[in-house]
From Swiss-Prot:
Protein name according to UniProt: Putative protein p14
Organism of derivation: Acyrthosiphon pisum secondary endosymbiont phage 1 (Bacteriophage APSE-1)
Amino acid sequence: MINWKLFLAAGLLLTITALSIVVRFQYVENSRLKLANQSLSAERDAARAQFTHYEQAVDIFNTIAGATQDAHQQAIQASQPQTIKIQEAITPERCAHLPVPTAAVNRLRAHADKISPRAASAHSSNVTR
């Protein structure tokens, strides 16, 4: 009878030891997973913040592009009456129907290439309308 009680006590001790080891491994694994989760959450939050900044930058660029396109369209519309007046004034002239010499075209293009866009935009307000 004593052997049976001793065997039962040893079995209980082994079971408790095994369960303690399993619980410890589970605790360590749980701690590791919590740290990994915190790290992934931080990465996710950083990625969201970065995406938000990119999204805001794209919105700003789209707004600027839209404003630039609107300004360009308004400039074209504002210059159309001038273009029509110039065409009406030039059309009766005999030379208006002659081709422009190639040398003159090349000189005008070379001169236009020398003018910087900044200088051209600075004088655009002086154009007679």
